Every structure is written in C-alpha cells, then in structure tokens.
C-alpha cells in the first residue's frame, strides 16, 4: 500500500511488516523504517496510514492507533482494530472494524463517542458533507461529524456495501446483489441500477466494477 503526504513523503506498508517513510530532498532519497522491532511503532499489523487536515500522520493497526511524531509513532489508542480515520477540522475520528467510533482532540486523550449497532462488521465508508456513512453487516449508519449523532440512512441502508469512487469523485456502492447505487457527492442524489440479474449473481464469486465518467457525462 502507498500514501503520499502533503510534504511529498511517500509512506509504504504491508500488513505485518510495519511501514517505511521515503523522503526526497536535495537530490537524494532517505527513508525511515517504522517497526515494532525498532521501538518506533507499537504494532506491525498496519491497516492504514492517513493524514488529517492539520497534516498529522496517523497509523492504524489491528492493535491500536499511533500518531507519528518525528521519527517515532506514539500510541494514542490501545485495543482498537483500526479500520478508517476521518478528519473534521481539528478533530480526528477513528472507526474500528466492529463499528466503534473514537474521537481524538489536541491535548486530550482519545475517547469513544459511539458504537454502531451490536459490533457489526464494517465493510466500507464514505463521506457526504458532514456525514460519515458506514456500511456494516446489518446495513448503513450515518454519523454526523459535527453533532456526533447517529441515524440510519433509509435510502442507502445497504448491508455489506462496498464503495468505489469514480473519476469525478462520486460514489458507487455494490454488495453482491447485482445492484449498484450511484451517489452524487455534492447533491446526494441517489440512483440505483440492476446490472446483474438477481438470479444470476450467485454464479459470481466477487463483483468487480470499473466506473468512469466520460466527457459527454455518460
């Protein structure tokens, strides 16, 4: 996996092997290896590396979340099976693989703000303005990043939804039913398409889509 931060540093990682930060400066490449064995990473089981709106780097793992400070990653939340991070202003939210959402603010300890459902497995997420939509085993939940309120999305209550983003930044959701939902990221307009007949979809092990808008808006 690869992530490039705003400073141009490239972060490379593989679950179980820690990560590497690669920097290009003055015509030379240098790198720092973050690994538990090097005492600069709490866990090698990395699930994501993300940058927030303030430019801070967060490393999520199956064993907790760490913030990168200099050339070391400092543990900020233990016993958290990290799935996704979401930045909202100066606030940072962490979502676990079983639907627990925690909040981290500058100068404060991380704290749990809500739990979605009864520990349902999380499949994917997407953001629509101030709403963080989380697709789980038992449908979708809407977490408002400003108010921290949770609701159920009736129009997008899609169990086991997987999200794909097209070349215009809009969302497409599918869940092995042969049906695909289009969501406009700006207007929140939703339209569904039955691309594979429901009685044929079980012949397919895994749905795969590649969605592109062309210059004719098709």
Predicted regions and their residues:
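Carboxylate-rich, polar loop motifs that coordinate divalent cations or form catalytic acidic clusters
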Residues: 1-218
């Amino acid at each position: 996996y690869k992530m490039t931060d705003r400073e141009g540093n490239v972060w490379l990682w593989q679950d179980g092997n820690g990560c590497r930060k690669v920097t290009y400066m003055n015509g030379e490449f240098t790198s720092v290896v973050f690994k538990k064995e090097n005492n600069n990473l709490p866990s090698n089981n990395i699930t994501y590396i993300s940058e927030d709106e303030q430019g801070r780097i967060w490393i999520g793992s199956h064993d907790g979340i760490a913030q990168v400070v200099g050339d070391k990653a400092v543990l900020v939340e233990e016993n958290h099976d990290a799935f996704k991070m979401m930045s909202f202003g100066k606030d940072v939210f962490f979502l676990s693989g079983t639907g627990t959402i925690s909040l981290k603010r500058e100068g404060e300890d991380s704290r749990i703000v809500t739990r979605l459902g009864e520990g349902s497995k999380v499949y994917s997420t997407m953001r629509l303005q101030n709403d963080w939509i989380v697709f789980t085993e038992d449908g979708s939940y809407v977490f408002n990043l400003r108010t921290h309120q949770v609701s159920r999305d009736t129009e997008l209550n899609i169990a086991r939804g997987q999200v794909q983003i097209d070349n215009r930044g809009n969302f497409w959701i599918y869940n092995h039913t042969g049906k695909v939902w289009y969501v406009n990221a700006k207007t929140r307009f939703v339209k569904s398409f039955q691309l594979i007949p429901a009685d044929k979809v079980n012949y397919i092990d895994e749905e795969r889509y590649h969605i592109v808008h062309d210059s004719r808006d098709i």
